[in-house]
Amino acid sequence: MVKLNVHNFMKKIATYVHPERGFLPDPDPLLELPLAYRAWDELNNAMPELLHNNDFRDALNNIPQLDPSGIKNGPELDRSMRQLSMFANAYVNWGEEPVKSIPKNLAIPLWEIAHRSGRPPIASHASIVLSNWRRIDPDGPIVPENLKTLQNFFGGKDEDWFYLATVGVESVGGCAMSKLFSCLDAIKNNKSNIVVTSLNDLASIIHKINLALERMYEHCRADIFYHRVRPFLKGWPDDGIVYEGVNEEPKIFFGGSAAQSSLLQTLDAGLGITHPSDKSGPFLIQMRKYMPPNHSKVISLLELDPILLKYLNKNKSIELKDAYKKCISGLNIFRKKHLEMAIHYISDQEKKGEEGEGTGGTEFITFLTTARNETHLLMEKE
């Protein structure tokens, strides 16, 4: 096992994670692209109405093929990635007839933008959540009440809230990263009192994350989510989708998933929670490919050396172990709540009609159950 150089790690982390926002972008997501890309902004704004009228595919087929080389890295790239990937999901997943390919006027720029973003050319958590909000009061907090989405499929309050409540979870969890990293820094300097304080602070933040997660129920109804939001977030079918003008070989990519959030995997890695089961571990590893590369690097760096677990094994302090156990307990509660939420929004809806996609929902429930059991097992060991 590689030994983690905490000093070098902290220097790298400073460029990957915001000390307050965590994995949310800073500055706020861009509100419009340069004029040369107005066609994308216009389709972005018209998408809900076009989907309602079953006109989206025709509209997309008729937009010009734009050269993405003029898109700058940073906010412009993030906005383009969100727009183009959500266009692709809408094109493939909603229409009277299934399609086998994405037209080249979308496929070519999407492929290039995705390559520059370091992510697959499909809508993922980083686009539909992390880069899909603006503040109503620019000086106000990043909380659901002060946010509006930048892009929707059908639109409506339920879809808005699904994205914005998740932004709220990411926002609350942003400070968790600085507490975790201050804990690691204190271990390096053998300051046990700061380690304990940092872990207790982290446990408090995890509790707030759990409260933020529960807010999903406030304005996102399960039947609306299942029938009007979830279909657009699906991955590509088993026979794949061709990106015209890029490659004639059909590609298969996963759809958007909360497992693509870097927040929970970072907490797992920092606290030493592992997922050895073949029902959880491989899926979590795959989901890292859908994260912004700098975010997944944080997880990989933390996994190099479980210094917190080693410190716990050497230090017999009851205060230290209690503080650590609070963190694990909080994550166990999070996974329990997330499992209950998935059952409510997916499994229960599948049972109500013939439109359910039983296997997809069942597999995700199995993953969540296994991940929760692995967290619970570590809690019982401590």
Question: What positions do the PLM features span?
Answer:
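Surface-exposed peri-terminal alpha-helical interaction modules
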Residues: 1-382
